[in-house]
């Protein structure tokens, strides 16, 4: 295990293994976000079973994704990859007529060295439908990094010329990260109140409406797991990244807006009052967790942002387990975490990259946190040991960005604690961790 000290934050790295939800699950929210798309996941039966269970979409609902199941002939190279993928894509074009087809590579395509990037341009030219290749294998990527690889591939497809004149009063700003439409509207309106116009969003609702990206444009991310997309936008598209904390919680949202305003030399107005009003409205939830402790085992790369928000709510964060940490992309978030700990006068949590779950269980046994935020695999065993847990995957699918959605975060965090209080009040102490 390696340990790195950085500005009073302690970074550790343990096993080098990923203990996370599979990154191909990004299909579940991206196919809904990009309305004219079709996602083709190229993998084995295991991938198919996972998608069926993770998404829970009935087959007669005709979702805009499918599984290209690799068979013995594919793995032994007896079948022609181009011919098989051509047959599937022509069928997709005939049945669904999408504006774009995404090929999602898996662990198996990585192991057998299937040349998806080489096949895609030839097939795209033949069938006249854009084919975007993204690797989302669990060997190299953690849970939410599946979205990162898709957006990084899409960033290279964004147009570079305007068909209408840009009338923005400032250098265009493009935001990146997949969020539900109501949250997108909220964040766009918050920036508009400060006089900042959002020129585009990656991903857009339709592939045919991808934002124009030119050299010198500003870009800002809304999620902490999009480091590859940020790198692609800076290096390939020559944009300027606004390094801001992420708009998760009232404190993060205010800091995100203030940082963007500072880049455009705009003095933000009303943010302090807006943040205070939100905190006041959350007091009924905060009272339940103030003074309690939380331990993050690590799963979705949202851990640092959530830990910072919960620290501001009065919780003590013992450890932040995280599958992968890009310290440059998350520099502003880490700085805000440090200043939050200083303001709240609490200890700095240890950040453990690629944590060893066995070691974590030992630390949980010693520390006895009031709540453990963990992947689904460990929730039931921890509950059996009398430890309150919350699935980290729920934070991925919930609306947690912006000022008004902070209540949803606390709704999730406090649910196990409220459940125990309710059981105790009913006299069912045998089922309660309070008893």
From Swiss-Prot:
Uppermost EC category: oxidoreductase
Pathway noted in the entry: Porphyrin-containing compound metabolism; chlorophyll biosynthesis (light-independent)
Cofactor: [4Fe-4S] cluster
Binding site for [4Fe-4S] cluster: 22, 47, 107
EC number(s) stated in the UniProt entry for this protein: 1.3.7.7
GO molecular function, one term: metal ion binding
Subcellular localization: Plastid, Chloroplast
Metal-binding as UniProt keyword: yes
Signal peptide: none
Cofactor note: Binds 1 [4Fe-4S] cluster per heterodimer. The cluster is bound at the heterodimer interface by residues from both subunits.
Catalysed transformations (reactions): chlorophyllide a + oxidized 2[4Fe-4S]-[ferredoxin] + 2 ADP + 2 phosphate = protochlorophyllide a + reduced 2[4Fe-4S]-[ferredoxin] + 2 ATP + 2 H2O
Superkingdom classification of source: Eukaryota
Keyword hit for Cell membrane: no
One GO CC term, this protein: chloroplast
Keywords recorded for this protein, A-Z: 4Fe-4S, ATP-binding, Chlorophyll biosynthesis, Chloroplast, Iron, Iron-sulfur, Metal-binding, Nucleotide-binding, Oxidoreductase, Photosynthesis, Plastid
Record GO biological process: light-independent chlorophyll biosynthetic process; photosynthesis, dark reaction
CDD domains per the UniProt record, alphabetical: Pchlide_reductase_N
InterPro entries: LIPOR_BchN/ChlN, Nase/OxRdtase_comp1, Protochl_reductN
Purpose of the protein: Component of the dark-operative protochlorophyllide reductase (DPOR) that uses Mg-ATP and reduced ferredoxin to reduce ring D of protochlorophyllide (Pchlide) to form chlorophyllide a (Chlide). This reaction is light-independent. The NB-protein (ChlN-ChlB) is the catalytic component of the complex.
Stated family: Belongs to the BchN/ChlN family.
Subunit comment: Protochlorophyllide reductase is composed of three subunits; ChlL, ChlN and ChlB. Forms a heterotetramer of two ChlB and two ChlN subunits.
Protein name: Light-independent protochlorophyllide reductase subunit N
């Amino acid at each position: 295990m390696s340990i790195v000290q950085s500005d009073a934050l302690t970074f550790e790295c343990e096993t080098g293994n990923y203990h996370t939800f599979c990154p191909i699950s990004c299909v579940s929210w991206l196919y809904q976000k990009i309305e004219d798309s079709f996602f083709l996941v190229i993998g084995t039966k295991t991938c198919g079973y996972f998608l069926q269970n993770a998404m829970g979409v009935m087959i007669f609902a005709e979702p805009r994704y499918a599984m290209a199941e690799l068979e013995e002939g594919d793995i032994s190279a007896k079948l022609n990859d181009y011919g098989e993928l051509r047959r599937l894509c022509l069928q997709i074009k005939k049945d669904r007529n999408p504006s774009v087809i995404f090929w999602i590579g898996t662990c198996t395509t990585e192991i057998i060295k299937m040349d998806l990037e080489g096949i895609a341009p030839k097939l795209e030219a033949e069938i006249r439908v854009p084919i975007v290749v993204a690797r989302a294998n669990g060997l190299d990527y953690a849970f939410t990094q599946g979205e990162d690889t898709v957006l990084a591939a899409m960033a290279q497809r964004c147009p570079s010329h305007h068909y209408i004149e840009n009338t923005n009063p400032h250098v265009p700003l493009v935001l990146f990260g997949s969020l539900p439409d109501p949250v997108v509207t909220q964040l766009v309106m918050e920036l508009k109140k400060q006089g900042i116009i959002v020129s585009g969003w990656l991903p857009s609702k339709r592939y045919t409406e991808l934002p124009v990206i030119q050299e010198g444009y500003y870009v800002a991310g809304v999620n902490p797991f999009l480091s590859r997309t940020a790198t692609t936008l800076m290096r390939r598209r020559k944009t300027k990244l606004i390094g801001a904390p992420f708009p998760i919680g009232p404190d993060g949202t205010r800091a995100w807006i203030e940082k963007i305003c500072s880049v455009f030399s705009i003095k933000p107005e009303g943010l302090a009052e807006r943040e205070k009003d939100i905190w006041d409205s959350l007091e009924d939830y905060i009272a339940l967790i103030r003074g309690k402790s939380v331990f993050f085992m690590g799963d979705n790369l949202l851990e640092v942002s959530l830990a910072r928000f919960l620290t501001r709510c009065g919780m003590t964060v013992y450890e932040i387990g995280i599958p992968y940490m890009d310290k440059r992309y998350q520099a502003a978030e880490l700085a805000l975490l440090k200043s939050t700990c200083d303001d709240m006068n609490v200890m700095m949590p240890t950040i453990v990259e690629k944590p060893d779950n066995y070691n974590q269980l030992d630390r949980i046994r010693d520390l006895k946190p009031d709540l453990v935020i963990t992947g689904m695999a460990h929730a039931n065993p921890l509950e059996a040991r009398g430890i309150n847990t919350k699935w980290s995957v729920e934070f991925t699918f919930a609306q947690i960005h912006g000022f008004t959605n902070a209540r949803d975060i606390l709704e999730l965090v406090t649910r196990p604690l409220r459940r125990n209080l309710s059981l105790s009040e009913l006299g069912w102490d045998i089922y309660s961790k309070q008893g």
